[in-house]
Every structure is written in C-alpha cells, then in structure tokens.
C-alpha cells in the first residue's frame, strides 16, 4: 500500500504572541463591541500561545483591497510553497538522499485562502525543475478538511500508480482574509484562532523502495479513506465572498455538531475495516480549536494523550486551516510508531464535511 516518506513545514517570518494579537484586537474592535473584554476571553480560553504570519502586525492596521490581498497571496504562496517543497524533498529527518522535483509524478495543491489561475502549482513548476508532464491536481475550498482530503486523494493516486512519487502542498495564508471592518462575532473568534501555515508531504506507491530512500524503519501506510458530507449544513462553515474579500462563516454550533455527528461517522468507517475505536492508537486530528478538541474527546471517548500532538500544534501555531493536520502528521512521522498499530487522521471542513484516513505502521 502507499506510504508516507517525508514531510516538512516552514515557519513564516512574523511570530506573534497571543497576548500581542489580543491587544491589537482590542484596539481594532474595542469601540464596536460593548462586551469586548468578555469576547476577548476567547484569546486565552482557546489555549493558543503563538502564531506565525506572512506579514507584520502593522500591515493589518491598514486598509487593503481584495485585489491587493490576492496579489500578495499569489506572490507569497509561490515563494513559501517552493521553500516547503524543497525542504520536504531534502529533509534529512526522513530521507537518505535529496530527491529532485523532476522525480515527482503528481502535485496536489491545497488551499482556500486565495485564488489564482493559472494555479499556484503551475507557477511553482515554472520556478522549480519539475518534469513538465507532472500531473497537477489543485484542490480549492475544502477549508480545514483540505489537508486530510489531499492526503486521501494522493494515497488513492499512488494506489492506482504504485511506482509514483507525489507531493501534497498546503498553503494557507488565513491572515490575508482579515476584515478589519467586519464587527461580527465570527470575525473576532476567527481573529483569535487562525494563522498562516505551509506544509508539504511526500507519498509513494508501494513499488517505490522505502529502503532506497528512507531513514525510517516504520512508515504510515494507507489502508482506506472516507469523505462524508452532512446534508443541509452549508451555513456551518465557509466564506461569504463580498466586494471587500472573503468573510468568515463560523457557526457556534460546530462543537455540538461534532459531538452528535462524528462518532457514528467514525465508527461505521472503522467497522467497514474490521476495527473499533479502541484499535486506534494514533489519532492524527486537525485541531480546529480547543472546543473542537474537547468535542473529539467527548464524541470518541479518547483521552487527552490521544490529542496531545494536535494540541501542541494548536498552542504553537494556531489553526492554519488545511495545513494544520499535515503539521500534526509530521510530528507523528518524526516520533514513529509500533509495527501493526493503526493511525486515524480526521479533519472537518465546509460543507459541512469530514475526511477520515486510516493508516497503519508497517
């Protein structure tokens, strides 16, 4: 079965503490909310400590048009995306020798925070030495579920083409969607949580020799995936596209939906693979926020040790939309696992939807 060979992430140039962002939010939103101090508790209750951004704090104090923000998205997505790819293909944590972009058979590009045609993958391929016949699969609009969905689609590609090497690159510059004049509670909560992130993983078909390329004795191998769309839930999460740009849609009911909907979804998927919740040893969860992680515990009966890696990423980086789960996955790949144990990746996104990926250490 296809397996994970390498991974990378990059730290964007501007590191801001949650305290500093909270002060900025008080300055920007203070006159618009009568209960601003109560609302600002979200910055502390969410347990995010630091976040990385592609622009400095002064940039957010100024007005920017949708066109200007999207132009910056294109420029920075190419710049930082190239860096993440090169790091993934040369990551000495995982690889014996550096791989070349020309060795890749397919390029999955995941994003929801900016738009480009030609897509970012095409622009990157013009700047790195890719084979011009590399298959390009850009995937847009899956939000926080996008990283897990990209993982699923890449695994399925390598299952069909067992000699293939493919990358999944996720670029999310959530901060470029910031609306300083949006005085909705959703925008304030989003400001307390979201950040910028770039991550990349390298996946290989089972006819690609792990012994030739990998420093690791164990790898997470793909077993199955499941995509699920909840009917009549379009208003739970997503964007409203307006003249000024992208406005966040973020329902307060998301934790409740997870508690009620996720467990039967996960259990039926595991049963189809002859497993139960207790068989999952590594839970590779997208940390949508502290309340989302708490909802995982309540819905699935997992203790805090099962979400420790996810919680660590949330504390250090915040919610980077689709990129976040790949940061979590990299932590598991560095740590390694016991042969035969199962890992389950899970992420939730607009639709409302979920993506589950079942893997096993081999």
Identify what each model region corresponds to.
Residues 112-113, 131-133, 138-159, 259, ...:
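Claisen-condensing/thiolase-fold acyl-transfer catalytic domains that form or cleave C-C bonds
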